[in-house]
Design a protein with these regions (language model features):
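Acidic, proline-/serine-/threonine-rich low-complexity intrinsically disordered repeat tracts
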Residues: 8-14, 52-59, 96-104
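A structural signal for short secondary-structure junctions
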Residues: 369-370, 462, 476-481, 573-579, ...
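Non-catalytic interaction/regulatory modules that flank or connect domains
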Residues: 448-516, 520-524
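Repeat-solenoid scaffold signature
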Residues: 348-472
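Sequence context of c-type cytochrome heme-c attachment sites
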Residues: 140-282, 288-349, 353-367, 488-490, ...
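Short, disulfide-bonded extracellular cysteine-rich repeat modules
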Residues: 1-7, 26-35, 43-52, 71-80, ...
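Divalent metal-coordination and catalytic microenvironments
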Residues: 176, 378, 486, 584
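Disulfide-braced loops of extracellular cysteine-rich modules
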Residues: 14-22, 34-43, 59-67, 79-88, ...
């Protein structure tokens, strides 16, 4: 109002209610607010910011012991173990307890035993059941013979086991004495010139492997199902000399025949174990001899070697599916069915059609072919597919230890398989693998040389004109014949060109060729020739080829080429691997003219087709 006066200043803003002693009123905002001015963790006491009084932590009373801790998470502190489960507290540390070793048997238990610790003292108990035997360190199921008291042994020798077998099986013993397996001879209805005879067979034949059994029985009869056949005094009517175990003992029992002992078991054989393991023959039993025929693994037949012991379907469709040899070959009265073309003995026929029938194919054209072509011809496209076989054996070079490593030389087959190509005991060999068979007409009839047969004079001097030791007889004109596959074994061996005899050498034992082969330092061709002369004299005398008072001289014998045909029956391949049309027809490598055809019936006219 025209007068100078002091302005009216509003009172400062204040906090309502008033702030505490340790607070200030912050008026910077729209509304005053009290804020603490004590630092974090401090409390206000009597207008001063001070640290709070913290009560002491809770503790366990009494204090916890070693390996414990005080747990204060609950209402009241409590001591708890600080060791993990299973640990113990020792000297203030958590440690694993010392566990005493479990009780054990001392001495330790043997194979097929378990240590029983449930009693006061550990004791070893047999783990095998009543129908099991310990063989090869394993409990193996066996037949009912396992528990027979009569087979508890001990047995002094093989005949002692056989004697016990005959107590229950006298008829079986009698039957076996009549078999070709036992006599190595039997009916030969298909053997040219010997159709009505029953005393010919393996022991009267000559071959181009180890030649003949005469004078070599002690070695050869390692594969005879008997004991003690050392010479012509062996009693084929004595059933106690039958070796039941070689055909019936479980292979895992360890039973085997020793080399050069006329069929005696190996010294390590457990005859009691073998006797208690007997059962139906398996391929191990049959293969113990047949896989090693001719002096070695797969040497002879070419379709029977040790690879078939654990055959796959690719190796052999029958054995690869678990079949045993006896499934096809066993007959009544211990007879074995079948006839090898190189043996000529039969005690019953065996043919694929026995199981598969005469028209096994869905394709009529194939069934039509089967009228004239054996099943094996197409279904065994090659033999010795898994392991090599001998295809040629030249005895004329034997006796030279200056060759190779003390008379042994190694080589390889076409696929790189290592084989022995020379052995001073036996000469030079040719091995082959995955061999395409040779083919011929066959109706079961064969021609086969015995040790007393003569060969056509003049043959054998050249490999192209060999002495034929064995061959099928049929040809294209024989209505019942079929084209069959064969392994043709070729070789060179000693002959008497004057008597035209294929000579039997004594190879094994005293007076034989093998033990007298000179050392490398003493080798001369003349010394080996003289050794052969002595060996041939001894063998020919035993075989009846010369008189007991006759002897050969070095110039009275010579070497000749030979061949022997053997039928191929095993190693049946899967169907997809069977021969097809063009494997034979329109194939220049297939020799139709050798089979009696004028030409290939598929591509020519008037060739001589039979179907």
């Amino acid at each position: 109002n025209g007068t100078c006066v002091a302005p009216v200043v509003p009172p400062p803003a204040t906090c309502e209610p008033a702030c505490d002693a340790c607070q200030t009123c912050d008026t910077r905002g729209e509304t005053p607010v009290c804020v603490d001015h004590c630092a974090p963790g401090l409390v206000c006491e009597r207008g001063t910011c001070v640290a709070p009084i913290v009560p002491p932590p809770a503790t366990c009373e009494p204090a916890c012991g070693d390996c414990q801790r005080c747990d204060t998470t609950g209402e009241s502190p409590v001591c708890v173990n600080n060791c993990a489960d299973g640990l113990l507290c020792e000297a203030g540390r958590c440690v694993a307890p010392v566990v005493p070793p479990p009780p054990t048997c001392d001495p330790a238990c043997g194979p097929c035993q378990v240590c029983d610790t449930t009693g006061a003292a550990p004791v070893c108990l047999d783990a095998c059941g009543d129908d099991e035997l310990c063989m090869g360190g394993l409990c193996r199921p066996v037949g009912m013979h396992a528990g027979f008291d009569a087979l508890a042994g001990p047995f002094a020798d093989g005949p002692a086991v056989t004697t016990q077998c005959l107590e229950c099986h006298p008829n079986e013993g009698h039957d076996f004495l009549q078999t070709a397996h036992w006599r190595w001879a039997g009916p030969t209805p298909n053997l040219e010139g010997h159709e009505g005879e029953t005393n010919l067979g393996k022991r009267t034949l000559i071959n181009n492997f180890c030649i003949a059994t005469d004078s070599n029985e002690t070695r050869c009869t390692q594969c005879h199902a008997g004991y003690g056949w050392r010479d012509d005094t062996f009693n084929f009517e004595d059933p106690t000399k039958i070796d039941c175990l070689v055909c019936h003992a479980d292979g895992a029992s360890g039973y085997a025949k020793a080399t050069g002992t006329a069929g005696a078991p190996v010294p390590a054989a457990d005859l009691t174990l073998a006797a208690r393991s007997v059962g139906r023959p398996t391929r191990d039993n049959c293969g113990a001899c047949h896989f090693y025929a001719g002096g070695g693994d797969n040497v002879k037949k070419g379709d029977l070697g040790s690879a078939l012991k654990n055959a796959t379907v690719e190796m052999d469709v029958h054995l690869g599916r678990g079949m045993e040899c006896a499934d096809c070959h066993a007959a009544d009265n211990h007879r074995v069915l079948g006839q090898g073309a190189h043996i000529g003995v039969t005690q019953g026929s065996l043919d694929c059609s026995n199981c598969h029938g005469g028209s096994p194919h869905a394709n009529g054209l194939l069934n039509n072919h089967a009228l004239d072509v054996a099943c094996q011809t197409c279904h065994v496209p090659a033999f010795s597919r898994q392991q090599p076989t001998k295809m040629n054996w030249d005895w004329s070079t034997a006796g030279n230890r200056t060759r190779g490593n003390n008379g042994v030389e190694q080589g390889t087959t076409a696929d790189g398989t290592t084989v022995t190509v020379y052995d001073a005991m036996k000469g030079d060999f040719v091995w082959e693998k995955n061999v395409r068979p040779e083919y011929a007409w066959y109706d079961g009839r064969v021609r086969r040389m015995m040790t007393d047969d003569t060969y056509p004079a003049g043959t054998g001097a050249d490999a192209g004109d060999p002495i034929v030791l064995g061959t099928p007889l049929a040809d294209h004109a024989d209505a019942d014949a079929k084209i069959w596959p064969f392994k043709v074994m070729r070789g060179r061996q000693a002959v008497d060109p004057v008597r035209t005899l294929v000579l039997v050498p004594k190879l094994f034992g005293p007076g034989g060729f093998w033990p007298a082969i000179p050392a490398a330092a003493a080798y001369t061709p003349e010394a080996v020739r003289a050794l052969w002369t002595s060996s041939l004299t001894a063998g020919a005398r035993t075989a009846g080829q010369i008189r007991a008072d006759e002897s050969y001289t070095d110039d009275a014998w010579t070497w000749a080429y030979t061949e022997m045909w053997m039928g191929i029956e095993h190693e049946v391949a899967p169907p997809a691997e069977a021969l097809g049309c063009q494997d034979c027809h329109a194939n220049p490598a297939f020799d139709f003219t050798a089979l009696g055809y004028a030409c290939d019936p598929l591509v020519g006219n008037n060739c001589g087709s039979r179907h």
